[in-house]
Structure formats: C-alpha cells, structure tokens
Amino acid sequence: MPRDESINKVLIIGSGPIQIGQAAEFDYSGSQACKSLREEGIETVLVNSNPATIQTDMEMADRVYVEPLTPEIVAKIIQKEKPDAVLPTMGGQTGLNVATGLAEMGALEGVRVIGSSIETIRNVEDRDLFDSFMKKLNEPVPAARAVSSVEEALEAVEEIGYPVIVRPAFTLGGTGGGVAHSRDELIEIATRGLEMSFINQVLIDQSVLGWKEFEYEVMRDRNDTCIIVLCNMENIDPMGIHTGESVVVAPAQTLSDEDNQRLRDAAIKIIRALKIEGGCNIQFAVHPETGEYKVIEVNPRVSRSSALASKATGYPIAKIAAKIAVGMTLDEIQNDITKETPASFEPTIDYVVTKIPRWPFDKFKGISREIGVQMKSTGEVMAIGRTLEESLNKAIRSLDIGADGFTETPYTRADLENPTDQRLFQVYTALRDGMSIEEIHGLTQIDPFFLQKISNIAEFESSITRESLEDPRILLKAKRMGFSDSRLASLTGMDESSIRALRLENNIKPVYKMVDTCAAEFEARTPYYYGCYDLEDEVEVSDRRKVLIIGSGPIRIGQGIEFDYCCVHAAMALTEDGYETIMVNNNPETVSTDYDISDKLYFEPLTLEDVLAIIEKEKPEGVVVQFGGQTSINLAVPLAEAGVRILGTPHESIDRVEDRERFTEVLNKLGIPQAPYGIAKSFEDARAVAERIGYPVLVRPSYVLGGRAMEIVYDDVELEEYMREAVRVSPEHPILVDKFLEDAIEVDVDALCDGTDVYIGGIMEHIEEAGVHSGDSACVIPPQSIPEDIIDTIKEYTRKLALELEVVGLINIQYAVKPDSDPSVYILEANPRASRTVPFVSKATGVPLAKMAARLMMGAKLRDLGLTEEKDIEHVAVKESVFPFIKLPGADSVLGPEMKSTGEAMGIDENFGIAYYKSQLSASMDLLNEGKVFISVRDQDKDKIADIVKKADELGFRIMATRGTARAVSDIADIEVVRKVSQGSPNIRDAILDGEVGLIINTPSGKQSADDGYLIRRMAVELGIPYVTTLAGARAALNAIEAVRMGKITVKSLDEYHGM
C-alpha cells in the first residue's frame, strides 16, 4: 500500500526554543521527518522559531518559516501555503498545543491532521477523557480527578487520600506539578498548576510513589501492524521522579518475562484503540511486590524517550513515523541500517544502554536540588556497554561534570529519601560506608538489583591497589566494568599515563561493536559503534581521507544545541567534499548522533582516553575541535600533546586568547583597547586591583564557558563574599578583575578567516546593556543604534585580531561600545572557535558559516568560496533567549554576567519593532497583554526612565509605580502610586494577582534577591506576565508594541527573505 496520493504538501510544526522538558530531541525528529517526506516526493513546509536547529536550514524543507509557534501565526502560514496536511507530532508538546489551537480556531478546514488526530490528542491530553478511555479498554489507571479550582482539588483528595500527585494538563515536562502530602502543600501546588495549564485544569492523581516505572515505544501503521521498538526501558528511579529526571536503562533489567508480555499487550492494545499512525510512548507503573500495573501516560507523538530508543537501537522512529503518517506501512519501509530488513522487524539489542540527565544547578545559587515530578534537567547523555556496570561508568564520565566515575558525595538519610541530582553518587557512598542494600532500598525504593550493580563497582574499587593492577586479568576486569584510566589512577595514586602505558604493554585496548538494530542477525550497512573490552572488533577501517569531529556532549546552560548544529554542518560540508567524516558524541537527543549525518558514528564519552582510542583505530588526517564548545576545546591541548593534528586555528592561539596576560600582549601590539583589569590570587590582590581601577568590577575565573561564577561587584564586602565562593571553582587558575563598563552597548561579531583574508559574517548589537551575559542578551542584526564609523572600527579590529591569531575557521569577538567616550570601542573577549550565535547569524544572512569554516580548515580559501564582500541584509533579525525560571522554583529571573538561558528564538521581519515582537512571542512573552504597565527601578536608573514613561503614556497605557520611581517621573505622566510588598496591603503583589498588570519593568537593586523586586519578578515568571529587567529591554518592548499596533504581522519564508 504505497503512500496516500492525496497528500502532496505537508506542514511540519517544530517545537520552538530549547527549554527544560523539550530539548534537542525534537530537532532530531523534525529533521528526520523533513528528510523522510521529501524522499517520498512530498513538498514540505516547516515552521519553527528556533534558529539553532538543523531543521530550520533552508535545504531541509521546500520552505522554512522561522516564525512564532502560536495558532494565530501558524494559521497565516496555512492560509498562504495551503498544505494538504499538518504533521504536529514531531514538535513535542508545542506541536500538539498548536494543532489543538488551530482546530479550535477553525483554521484546519480542508487540512488533514496526520500522525495523531485532534481527537486522539484530546483523548490523551485531557485527563478525564483519558481516564474514561482507559476504563473502556479495561486498562487500569491511578485514581484521578481533573479539577479546575483549588476547592475541587480539596474535595478530590478526600476521595483519593494523601499523598497525591498534582499535574497540570497540557504542559510540558511536568511544569507546575508536585507531590502534596498535606492540605497546605496541595493548595500551593494546585494554585501554581492551575495558572500554568493552558486549559486551567490540574489532575489530582492517586500516588504510586515507589512503584517501578517502565516505558514502551510503539509504532503502528494504517494496516494495524504494531511493533515495539527497543523491547522496553526501565527507570532506575522509582515512580515519583519524572522519567526525564530518571536514570534509564534498556533493556529493562528487573521485569519478568510474564510481566513484560502483559505490558507489551497493553501497549499494543492502547495504540490500536487510539488509532495512532506513527510512534507513541506509553509509561507504566508496576508494583514491586504484586506486579499490579497502572497506565501512567501516553504521548501520541515522538518524545525524548523515542529519541533515546532510536539511538539505543539504530531504529529511526521519527523517520518511519513520518512515512506512516502519509499512509505507508511498516512492511514497505526499508530499515536503513541493514538495508535488507523491513521496518516491521522489531529491533533487538545485545548490549546495555544507560541514560543519565544533566542538571543546571551549578548555574543557580540557592535553589532546591531536589528532583521529582517536575523536570529540571536540561539535557542527557547515553552510554552503551556490554554490562550494566560498564554502561553506568561510561555514562557518568560522559556527563562532563568533572567526575571520571562514581565519586564519594556527602549524604544524609533524608537525602536518600528525598532524591537530588546527586542521588547516584550518594547511594554509591552509602554502599561504600557499609550501609546494607536492604536499608538503602527501604530509603530510596531503588530495586535491589540496581543497588547490587552499584555495590559491585564499589566493592571492586575497594580491592584495587597499585600492585593488583599489574595483573593483566585484574586490569582487564576493571576496563570491562567501565573504569577509565583516570579513575584507576585516582584509586591507586598513580598517574593516568602510567595506567595507559600498563594497558598498552598488556595489549588491553578497546574494540568497537556495531549498533545494528538486529543483534547481528543481519549485516549492518550503516556504521554506528560503541567501545568495549571484548574480543572481536567490528570496525572496518577504510583508507579514505578522514576527519574526526568532536561533538559537544549533553545540552546544558552555556553549551546548547548551537554547538551540535555547528558539528552537523561541519560533517555535511566535509562529506560533500569527499572526506570520510567520523563523529564522536554521547548525546542521544541530537542530530549529530543520527546514523546518517556522518560516515561513521562513535557513541562514546568525550574524554581524552576515549577519543584517543578512536583516533588510534581510525587514523584520521586531523581532528576538528572548533565546533563542540568548551567540551571539545578542552581536548585540543591534550590531543595535540599526544601528537594528534588539530585542524584549523593552531591550539597555541586558543591559549593566547584564554590566558589573560598573553591576550593583553596581543591587544597592546595591535593597539586595540580593553577595559582596565588585574589578576588576583587572593582577596588582598583583588581588593588592590579594585582600588586601582575603581568599582564596580566584573570578577570571574579564567577558562570558563557560559560565564560560570562571574559576577559584578560594587564594594569590598561583595568582593570578599565572591572570592570565598569563586576561588573554589578553579584553584589552579587565578581570578580576573575587570573594570565594569557601565551603560556600554555590547556587540558580538562572528567572522571567518583563512589565514590571509577575513570575512565578517555578522555584527550583532545586544539589546541588554553590557553586564548581561552575551548568551542571555537579546541581539539584533543589523545593528540599530551604532554609528557607521564605530562599525568600521569594529570591523578593523576584528580583521587585525583574526589575522594576528592565525585563525583558520571561525572566531567570535565581543566588544563594548561607548559612543560618546574615547576610546569608544573596547574588546571584551575573543573566542577562536564556533560561538553560540553562529546558527542565528547563518539564518539571518543566509550564509552557512559553520560549513564554510569546515572547508577553510581543510585548506579552502574565502575567495574560492565566494566570500569576499560581507552580505548586507534588507530585513531585521532578532535573537531572544529563553529561560528555565518557571521550571526552577526559587530561581531569580534577573539577568547578569552568569548565563541562565537554555535556548533561543528568532524574530525576523522588515522592521525592528515587529521582529522584536515576534522574538518575544516566540519566547512565550506576549507583549500585547491588556493591563497596566508597572515600573519600579533602582536608584541609579531613576533619571534614565523619562523616555520609557513618556512612550508608555503615549501608547495609552495606565502606569503604576512604587513611590520612589513615581516621584522621579511624576511631571511626565499620571502615575498611580502603589505600595511595595514590604509596606503593607494593598500592594503591588495584590495588583498583580488581581490581573491588573500587563507588563512589568523592574531593574534589580543590589544583590538582595530576597527583596521586593525578586518577589515581583518571580510572580511575573509564575503568572506568565511579560517582564523586563533592563531599561534597554523596556525600550525595545514598548517600540515593539507600537510597531505591532501600527503595522500588520506578516509571515515570510527564509528563502523569500534571502531572495532565493
């Protein structure tokens, strides 16, 4: 049954910016869907607001729209493009919500919804419908009630009994959910949940805390053929911890064959009843003693778990789901890995896969590290091993958190009962301390089987000595359990190179096994490998010219999908140019770990030992470290010292930039100004520097990504507090103390250099003033307020510096501009590698910078690539950052030098105001709210807000302000004075709760985050009220509101903007 001939044009809805609960897995699924449908001759139209995705590259679909993912905007695209069908199931929760919204607006007349019907989405997402649907099937679900008020929640709990799990309907990653053990907790969680559900509904569920959790990925086609992909997955953590927060293993380890059969049958029964055509994820809870099970949830779309199942088996769920959505059947779709089996063969595996989440707690001081029913992790890693112990050890060192294996971590009994992100390490430490498996099981509800595996690792470590490792059998056993050389070195007091030498002397080297979807039953044609210490090696090494690309590992704040984007582009460019490309990475969510992006894929930890072993096996011409963010840059020097050729910019140049004193010498030689600074190894040093250059100063450790431990301090007291904290971050590296340039405009430049010529890819003006981390600030191309002569100076400095550093490939330089001072341009920092703005600049200008950079590294010249004149654009593109505050109770939404954003959205239009408005809408901030504007600013800003107040007044807003702010501008407009929270009721908090306020402008005073400002900002986050914490942001917001009121919002595809 070939594809449905009535479907010739499909609109694919993407998932928008990377956020907690919805990360790179949807770029992977959306990209696969685009490719898959085009293979079938279907015209594809894609809409997504995230510029850092591969799917928004112009060549991925016939037309790509980078527009806000709201039903109103997507309806305009449907009107313009007239697709035959809409595919929402590749866009995560966002895709489903947009599709539901479109249906409610009546915008889907004559357009089919494929993959999952609107009825199916509602049956699964609306809890009452879901429960009654499951009851019709005789499938058990936890007792639950859907409620629309706190009163109803209190009534429901009388029936169900405490503890209850509270979950808002139609949200993502458990946003707003929690476990309530008492009336007070229920009132607090239900209030928050009702605000966050876009249908104002929360579910009060009977608690199945402590039950085991299993997941099944099921595929179904229109012939009703169903298969289970990846047998099943088991969460090591029991119910009560969101599956996205759990350590997950596949195949399941503690499920009996009989129970597996029951859950399999139930999964197939459910997908058939729901009539889903494509992929679906089903989660079950199983009682550890009785084997009783409950259906917890069904996702009628591809998900985080389906990305994991795809990478764990090599079976491309999204690609196959897209073909099924247009009417093809499993038996007609070829398995790309074997090229001879159909997609209806269930994949099987003969290894163990472990997934561990990566959390952002290092970025947010003072917030709870507890994990539970609401997701907090930003990304994840996956590792493959022959045993669970090996797989676990490899996954831990893939996390890139400075741990080369299980490490001793302080714990209390309460920590074991109320898990945090440190859970695995605390369990390991308790076992090492002699606590019994039974006792730990009682506290954690983790199955004794898994505790025994961790105990095996702890026991083996206790037996290792310097002498015992000289026995090759013991060394081989250690390697087979997944111990890294560096871990063995720290356990025995030896150094890593001695362990390596000992290993090589005894010919103990890893071999590589293939991930082939069929446990070696058929021959695989797509080389996708993992390393282990087994006997037979399955890699066929070719004699082609090869390049190895080091990926960027798990998504975390400071190192997001942008770097994966650059790695994929490098692989594509070098493959096009005839090189064999080899990708090394360990992130199951991303496009770079797709089996058909590079010629060979190694799913391995990104450590020196693991990467060197692959290099020794493959013997590439060189290694690319420029694209994988700090993770791959950190490997440049050790790899070069091991004799590996680093392609592109010499690694020596990286040190010339990252070592501050050497960088200053470079700048002095070139005559490029930088802010006064000093280097300090103690508080006394730092105070002396601050006295010499004057407060405020920006303090930070050297060698750091995402501005970690970076702060602006205003006096000695704050400086001393910082030094106590930060010196611990990096003891061997001193602290930098820079003069903070207040009120400067920050500018980012991405450029290409081939060693002789420089091409300026894009100059971005930041909208937030200097002092907000460049990864968090909104920015705009082309610059809107910077005079031409200053732009020329910036270009000149960029050229000089790129040539001096002998850059081959990409360089990113950040400047601070003070137009009225002399000098007017200061350099802040330079990074001779891909930056997080590369995808945005590429989308804004239409020039694929990362691809070009890869070609330059292989010897091409800018002239040959046609890059002589930089590209002027007629439109305006704005990048806005997206923050995780809503997912992290207690986090302050103030922006500063430490990066806090997880992702980005882009707005593009003919004028700045509308482009900025689109960028805000894409970041879930609708500026066109009704309501008053509330303004409260710190003392040093009070004389700078006249124009803001005037503009708000001209736009017809009623303005509220606190007394001090109102006094400063009372002659400009009528201001309603409102009390601070600390001044008694009625106050600003009451006004916000009553829905009077539609926009909040609040600049933070000092560092007391417990102040009124913090409370207001936190309420804005939780209630979804647009807020800005900088004056520049406020000006941009008001200009955007004006532009939208005056003009019409139109949609255009990228190829229309780029005149193609």
Swiss-Prot record:
Mn(2+) 3 binds at Q814, E829. Mn(2+) 2 binds at E297, N299. Large subunit of the glutamine-dependent carbamoyl phosphate synthetase (CPSase). CPSase catalyzes the formation of carbamoyl phosphate from the ammonia moiety of glutamine, carbonate, and phosphate donated by ATP, constituting the first step of 2 biosynthetic pathways, one leading to arginine and/or urea and the other to pyrimidine nucleotides. Pathway: Amino-acid biosynthesis; L-arginine biosynthesis; carbamoyl phosphate from bicarbonate: step 1/1; Pyrimidine metabolism; UMP biosynthesis via de novo pathway; (S)-dihydroorotate from bicarbonate: step 1/3. Keywords: Amino-acid biosynthesis, Arginine biosynthesis, ATP-binding, Ligase, Magnesium, Manganese, Metal-binding, Nucleotide-binding, Pyrimidine biosynthesis, Repeat. Pfam families: CPSase_L_D2, CPSase_L_D3, MGS. The gene is carB. Mn(2+) 1 binds at Q283, E297. Residues 925-1060 form the MGS-like domain. Residues 540-926 are annotated as: Carbamoyl phosphate synthetic domain. Binds 4 Mg(2+) or Mn(2+) ions per subunit. This is Carbamoyl phosphate synthase large chain. Mg(2+) 2 binds at E297, N299. Mg(2+) 3 binds at Q814, E829. GO terms for cellular component: cytoplasm. Its EC number is 6.3.4.16, 6.3.5.5. Residues 401-539 are annotated as: Oligomerization domain. PROSITE patterns: ATP_GRASP, CPSASE_1, CPSASE_2, MGS. It comes from Methanothermobacter thermautotrophicus (strain ATCC 29096 / DSM 1053 / JCM 10044 / NBRC 100330 / Delta H) (Methanobacterium thermoautotrophicum). The keyword Disulfide bond does not apply. Disulfide bonds: none annotated.
